[in-house]
């Protein structure tokens, strides 16, 4: 039975946030991994997940190449740092990669078919892609309309193909979530990405490579999101 609204009462707006998963994850696994965060944000923001376009052929990649504890059913990624082996390592410098056309088209399709969105969130490789999307938005790319970005365990892509996206300071309002004991994406790697944003909000937590959602972090999430609810 539907709830009855009080006459004249203003309905509270809930932010819609497009969420990009990490390497070797997918829509379903990231939905499960963000369960605690979605609970903390209930009534303020809804997360909408979707899968990256590239299938990862080898789920047993070398340590440090991807995100641990992911469901292996349809492991996916946004791009490969080594196109010949269809693999990705955030610490691998590469002159070429699998390209951004497919992932950007996938995200643009999500904006078109699932949007509109108030913000965009990314985890690990997804956060690296979010940073690039922020740069494209700033340059006037008409496919991406949003007001803020949340980057969890983000890093700067080491592919020379992506270097152009870091040439100008990124002015999109951003919250960067960094794990002090993250052994997959070190805090130093995340801080390097932060340096490319103007006036970033930084949330440090004592944990590792995951999306934190305990009470202390909730306060920071809320304060950041509330700026866009007015």
UniProtKB/Swiss-Prot annotation:
Disulfide-bonded cysteine pairs: these are none
Q: Please verify whether the record's keywords include Cell division.
A: no
Which GO molecular function, any one, fits this protein according to its record? hydrolase activity
Protein biosynthesis among keywords = no
EC id: 3.1.1.1
What's in the keyword line of the UniProt record? Hydrolase, Serine esterase
Q: What does this protein do?
A: Exhibits ester hydrolase activity with a strong preference for long-chain alkyl ester substrates and high selectivity against a variety of short, branched, and substituted esters. Is able to hydrolyze ester bonds within a wide range of p-nitrophenyl derivatives (C2-C14) in vitro, with a strong preference toward substrates of >8 carbons.
Q: PANTHER family this protein is in? A: ESTERASE OVCA2
Write out the similarity annotation. Answer: Belongs to the LovG family.
Task: From the Swiss-Prot or TrEMBL record, give the protein name.
Answer: Esterase OVCA2
Species the sequence originates in: Xenopus tropicalis
């Amino acid at each position: 039975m539907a709830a009855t609204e009080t006459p004249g009462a203003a309905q509270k707006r809930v932010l819609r946030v497009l969420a990009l998963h990490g390497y070797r994850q997918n829509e379903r696994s990231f939905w499960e991994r963000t369960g605690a965060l979605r609970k903390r944000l209930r009534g303020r923001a809804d997360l909408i997940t979707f899968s990256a376009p590239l299938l990862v052929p080898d789920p047993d990649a070398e340590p440090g190449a991807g995100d641990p504890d992911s469901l292996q059913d349809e492991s996916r990624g946004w791009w490969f740092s080594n196109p010949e082996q269809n693999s990705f390592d955030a610490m691998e410098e590469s002159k070429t990669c699998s390209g951004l056309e497919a992932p950007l088209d996938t995200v643009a399709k999500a904006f078109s078919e699932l949007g509109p969105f108030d913000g965009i969130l990314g985890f690990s490789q997804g956060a690296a892609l979010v940073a690039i999307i922020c740069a494209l938005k700033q340059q006037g790319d008409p496919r991406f309309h949003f007001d803020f970005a949340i980057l969890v365990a983000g890093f700067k892509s080491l592919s020379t193909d992506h270097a152009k996206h870091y040439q100008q300071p990124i002015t999109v309002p951003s919250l960067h979530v960094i794990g002090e004991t993250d052994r997959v994406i070190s805090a130093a790697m995340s801080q390097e990405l932060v340096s490319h944003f103007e006036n970033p909000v930084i949330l440090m937590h004592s944990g590792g490579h995951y999306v934190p959602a305990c009470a202390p972090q909730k306060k920071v999430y809320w304060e950041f999101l509330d700026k866009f609810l007015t």
